[in-house]
Regions:
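Extreme N-terminal basic, low-complexity initiation segments
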Residues: 1-10
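Short hydrophobic targeting helices and cationic amphipathic motifs
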Residues: 4, 20-22, 27-28, 32-33
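Juxtamembrane/membrane-water interface recognition
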Residues: 10, 31-33, 38
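General helical secondary-structure elements
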Residues: 10, 24-25, 221, 232
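Polybasic, lysine-rich low-complexity intrinsically disordered segments
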Residues: 17, 35-37, 43, 50
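Small-residue-biased structural context
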Residues: 44-291
Length: 291
């Protein structure tokens, strides 16, 4: 007690004593430093937990933690969109990949995903809007350019590289699939997902849609995703992973760049729907109907 008397002095209450004590410059600095250390540790723990990966997780679940992981999976040819429901270890064993090496690469990848793009925690309505604004827009903007360049190199180089006609056939298949697919999402499925979100916010049960349950259009969308995914795989195989031949001109190079970027965008597009938006929409509908 004599120490406390010496430390605090003679003041009326312990609140005043503590305030005066912490007001001293030394203790203010110590308190501020302790607070910074605590916040830093919380941030480190958040990113450690966010990027914790188990071999038994599905590849879709892994990319859902951080969409930046997609570029590592792309490098190893791991299908995380249409094949996102397969476990990571199963894919590694099937394709003779070093699981430990890939996990190390994933965990050492710089955090590229800002809070604005933490898709796993997006509001479902906002995620649907994001898919339309970013990925549907990307498809519609790039189709005319790919049409122009791909048809051009088929005319100029098709005789020496007949595989280009197979590329064109598969590209036209995925193009038509997407041009029919996107309006179904924009006009039927996504508006219903918005209604589910609004119903949850207002604590009411949503009216049953004419298609019965959200599972029905989702099942159709996933089948169409599979078709588009198969066509892009065929394109990658026909082009030997977009490898340019020795006689490739600038138009050839631009075409392959456009096709590869189209494929990468489609992979993320399908991942956001198959592995995040669709499962959560199904769970939300079931929760609201069973409430």
């Amino acid at each position: 007690m004599p120490f406390l008397m010496e430390l605090f002095g003679k003041v009326e209450s312990w609140h005043e004593k503590l305030y005066l004590h912490l007001s001293k410059p030394f203790f203010r600095r110590a308190f501020y430093l302790t607070k910074k250390i605590f916040i830093y540790n919380e941030i480190v723990l958040f990113f450690f937990q966010k990027n914790m990966i188990s071999k038994n997780m599905t590849v879709g679940e892994i990319v859902a933690k951080n969409v930046a992981f997609a570029e590592i999976f792309e490098k190893y040819g791991i299908d995380f969109c249409c094949g996102g429901d397969v476990s990571f270890i199963e894919i590694c064993e099937k394709n003779n990949l070093d699981a430990e090496k890939i996990i190390a690469e994933l965990q050492n990848l710089p955090e590229k995903q800002s809070a604005d793009h933490d898709f796993e925690n997006f509001d479902l309505g906002d995620l649907a809007d994001y898919i339309v604004d970013v990925h549907h827009t990307f498809v519609r903007e790039n189709i005319p350019r790919i049409d122009e360049y791909l048809n051009k190199i088929c005319r100029v180089h098709g005789e020496n590289h007949p595989e280009l006609f197979g590329v064109l056939e598969n590209y036209e298949a995925v193009r038509e699939e997407l041009l029919a697919h996107m309006p179904k999402e924009e006009n039927v499925l996504f508006p219903y997902i918005h209604r589910l979100v609004d119903a949850e916010k207002n604590n009411i049960a949503p009216a049953k849609p004419p298609f019965g349950t959200v599972k029905n259009p989702i099942r159709m969308m996933e089948m169409e995703h599979d078709n588009a995914g198969d066509a892009t795989k065929n394109i990658r195989n026909l082009t030997n992973n977009f490898t340019l031949p020795e006689d490739a001109c600038n138009s050839y190079r631009i075409t392959f760049e456009l096709l590869e970027n189209f494929e990468k965008d489609l992979h993320v597009h399908i991942h956001l729907e198959n592995n995040i938006l669709f499962p959560k929409a199904i769970a939300l509908e079931e929760k609201l109907w069973n409430a």
